[in-house]
Design a protein with these regions (language model features):
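Pyridoxal 5′-phosphate
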Residues: 2-445
Length: 445
């Protein structure tokens, strides 16, 4: 076959990868595809909750991830999630194509896939495509809004100490540089009372309050915040709301406009399993013109959402790989994913509660948590627990030694097996036993 024919075939396949409708064969190789189609037919009548405990269904999904057989068990998917192998392969193929002639294939071929991708992301989020900007992560998305809104000296912004660190730093920088007032609430999580949280934000409001910044799912311990109730309360006082959806989009079953916020930013490389370094910004259409772009644009006061995509040279392979992640995600379904991951979290957390010396720092009730939970072992610092889990048991978690939290964050994903969680529980049991008062007393004798 000629080089020209090869290239034409490659481009055709690339287009299919970016926008093709989901099919079992597009997720797995031929063997897995047949199995998945059979499972889908068999479990079609199951509710998401019923399907959450059907291990033969999920074992097929698990085989789509190379991470499921990695030497280190990754239980920090809240930080960044691996992509299914087909997403990795798509990015690799797009990268190969780009390197055949970067300026041509990136700008004139792959870049043409952005508008179809925008439409598909909007469909998943229940939004207008003209409200969706594609970028690299939640920090970039939310910093666009944080730095893009006009505020005057003395104007107040309300957040909390458990918002994501990069967002807190952005507000503190504006406070230091421009003289705005950044007020932060403190909470004792877990909280199983929405009204208590809403009231805390309400009581912090003054006549100078302009913005409330709220995190949908608290990244530290997984608390789900009552975003819709906070937004409604804020709007009653004429206050805009910025929503950090880094840990909710692609995991919780919701539509962005239903939250009733004004601005929403997320990373796509968490529970959507998109390529690492992909994100999204949503701005309510009538608010777009008032937000200055984070990076320069020729029409900064435009109503066109694309003014927030002036990133210069970016990774088009990563951006277009989002399309395959959407295929994979939509093949499962958001509600099915939510119920499965919540089941996995409760599976290990409920058993961990039976281990003497182990404490869970997260609610196990559905309205208040999903994937993430914090765990601690008496007698161990968070960093000591994290280090022991990794060095002795090859389990990767992340220590959270922050404010009133002293725990390790654990976050499974759809590729996590029950046997993986059993391994984690055995490790917790061993470490809790070694650090029990009885054993510690014997060591000191």
């Amino acid at each position: 076959m000629s080089t020209k024919s090869n290239r034409r075939s490659f481009l055709k396949n690339a287009t299919l990868l970016a926008g093709g409708a989901f099919s079992a064969q597009s997720i797995f190789n031929q063997a897995y595809g047949a199995i998945f189609e059979d499972l889908s037919a068999r479990y079609n009548a199951f509710s998401p909750g019923e399907l959450a405990v059907q291990e033969d269904y999920w074992s097929t999904i698990q085989q789509a991830y190379s991470a499921s057989s990695a030497p280190v068990l990754n239980l920090n998917n809240g930080g960044v999630s691996p992509s299914p192998m087909l997403v990795q392969q798509a990015v690799e193929r797009y990268n190969q194509l780009s390197n055949q002639g970067p300026s041509y294939y990136m700008w004139r071929i792959l870049d043409q896939g952005r508008e179809p991708l925008r439409e598909r992301l909007a469909a998943l989020g229940g939004a207008d495509p003209e409200e969706i900007a594609i970028n690299r992560n939640a920090t970039e998305a939310l910093n666009t809004v944080i730095y893009g809104l006009d505020l005057s000296r003395g104007d107040e912004v309300i957040g909390c100490y458990f918002d994501y660190g990069n967002m807190m730093q952005a507000w503190r920088q504006r406070e230091e540089r421009e003289g705005i007032v950044y007020k932060q609430l403190d909470f004792e999580f877990p909280i199983e009372d929405d009204d208590l949280i809403v009231q805390a934000y309400k009581e912090a409001i003054t006549e100078k309050t302009k913005i409330i910044h709220v995190t949908h799912v608290i990244n530290w311990v997984g608390q789900i915040m009552p975003v819709k109730k906070i937004c409604r309360m804020a709007h009653e006082h004429g206050i805009e709301v910025i929503v950090d959806g880094a840990h909710s989009f692609g995991l919780l079953d919701f539509k962005i406009p239903e939250l009733e916020g004004d601005y929403f930013g997320t990373s796509l490389h968490k529970y959507l399993s998109a390529p690492i370094g992909s994100g999204m910004l949503w701005i309510k259409k009538e608010k777009i013109s008032k937000v200055w772009p984070l990076l320069c644009n020729g029409e900064p006061k435009s109503v066109n959402i694309r003014k927030f995509e002036s990133l210069g040279t970016r990774s088009f392979p990563i951006e277009q790989g989002i399309g395959e992640a959407l295929n994979f995600h939509n093949g499962i379904g958001t509600k099915r994913k939510e119920e499965r991951v919540r089941y996995l979290k409760n599976y290990w957390a409920e058993k961990a509660l039976a281990i003497p010396g182990v404490r869970i720092h997260t609610s196990l009730k559905a309205p208040y948590s999903c994937a993430i939970a914090g765990v601690s072992v008496a007698g161990m610092t968070p960093k000591n627990l994290e280090n022991n889990l990794l060095s002795r048991f090859q389990i990767h978690t992340v220590a959270i030694p922050y404010r009133n939290l002293d725990c390790v964050r654990v976050s499974p994903h759809v590729y996590t097996r029950l046997s993986d969680l059993d391994k984690f529980l055995r490790a917790l049991g061993i470490l809790a036993g070694e650090n029990s008062p009885q054993n510690m007393g014997e060591k000191g004798a």
